[in-house]
Amino acid sequence: NNASGLAGIAYWINDYYCLPEDFKIDKKDSLVVKMKEIIDEEYAQGRNSILGDDELDNMIRAIDRDRHREYVAFGRVRKAGR
């Protein structure tokens, strides 16, 4: 949501993709910074609902397709209801 900061975005990525310790990212990562910019712009343009997992996943794919592919390759993407 619009109250999530950089650390919250990094946490979501690490958790959603179940990244192993060696691949975890932090709030200073360029992907996290770019996502925050996009999210902030969405809310600045009037969005008032939270972004869902699918939207965030697609955002990562749009920003960095190679990294997205790497994350998904772990094969442990958190599924709904899990």
Which residues are covered by each model-predicted region?
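Terminal or standalone catalytic/regulatory effector modules within metabolic enzymes
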Residues: 1-82
